Amino acid sequence: MANEGLVIRGISVTEELYDLLLFLTHSFVRPTTTELYSIKHIDVTVGENPKRLILTIRKGKTGYRTSNTMPAAVSVYERICERYSNFQAEDYIFLPNYQNRTTASKIIQRQFNELLNRESLELDPQTGKKHMLYSLRHTAICMRIINSEGKVNIFNLAKNAGTSVDQIERFYAKYLPLSAEMARNLQSFGE
């Protein structure tokens, strides 16, 4: 969409949409004005060993927290820093030219909806529910559980995502596919 010069309601679609979608799927943050759209450069620290971003979420749904990302979020942040090379510590990392964060959020939501429409992905084929940016938070949490083959510490994942183990069980884990690793985990007697 960015390569074709698409304009939605007077705003050009740029590579920033791609980076924001990747960031969401590798950071566990909520796509809200108090989480994703409120992150400033001062709230981001690049960590090593393991490679990650350490995000300070100041006014998230569950209050203040620090959160680790997956390694892929680091390269996204590096591209953001290159794109806005003259950034200041107090600048927002996404759509920094829009001080009104509700406006920034709506711009991305419109672009994301157009992407879903173009790819005929408006609805989840299994649940029948409408896809939205928030779906990418679900994807991030579920990918972590699946890719760890069930070995991720669910309490740690919940704390990092600013949610609870109960919420993960009720809204995320119930949609996960069964796997051989899950069966081995269920049948194990410890090591």
Put a short name on every predicted segment.
Residues 1-6, 37-79:
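Conserved tyrosine-mediated DNA breakage-rejoining catalytic core shared by Y-recombinases
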